[in-house]
Amino acid sequence: MTLNRRSFIAAAGAAGALLAAPSILGAAGKITLRMGHPHPETDSWQDTALWMGETLAEKSGGEIGLQVFPNGLLGNDPTMINSVRAGALDIMVTGNPFFTSLAPELNVLDLPYLFHDRDHVARVLDGEIGDRLRTDFEGTGLYALALWETGWRHVTNSRRPVETPDDIKGLKIRTTPNPAHIEAFRLLGAVPTPMAFTELFTALEMGAVDGQENPTTLILNSRFYEAQKYLSLTQHAFTAAPLVTNAAKLDAMDDDMRALLIETAQEGARRQRALNVEREVTSLAKLREEGMEVVETPDRKAFRAIVAEPVQASFGEEFGSELIEQINAAA
């Protein structure tokens, strides 16, 4: 679906009406859930959300439907989170950093250079640590159905290639609102500038920020290459993406419906992460085709030396070092 200006205004108006209404409930107990996310329609989140809708409909015998609204159509990240908490939106997914003010222990997942590889990520997200972190949402009005991913984060900018920490000094870099991300770029001498993902392209285009940090899939799908010349594969952090629903609405479902939704969301997490792995490879090739200059082997050891220990120590001071030790032990 491509939205021109007129259709976007019409769709946005419809979205406003949807947010003002409760879940669509039929006479025979049928329910249509609404799900929003900020990523483009070409992203693995959208593909997986559509798969979830098909699976829920099939396995429930048509009792559960899922309407999916991509591109931040129902609001930016904080708006959609608050809409789910209020019960105006049923499900949403976005990057872990946008939840850390509600569920502070989730900050651990965003610590720089915490994860060694994808096997390490899977052992953490799909194991006891992931289960523990999902319970951190208790009392927030949200229930974490599963942990999807955004992926490995890399730096882009419009000024110069970034090969060493010195190259990033002075650059105004859009970050998420996560304290670990902000502190890491501050330590590197950059100017971290948190903002919603839906506002980022315009900020890059207008020069309000020099650069940003995201996975290659999002850099491609969001067309950031139109405003950014240089990509450095810093792989400085991995971003999980909690898929959340309204806790009270989930509790109100019958046992079979609730179990099916959770099972489908968690199977969707495994599918989405596998799909993202494939697209990370193809997206990098396409970014080169679009003219981006890629620094494949920046001095990650030097970046790690500056940010890893102090940011992890800061987390440990606030929340204790137990979680970090458990994650390190899962490597």
Positions of predicted regions on the chain:
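N-terminal secretory/targeting leader peptides
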Residues: T2-L3, S7-P22, G26-H120, E128-I129, ...
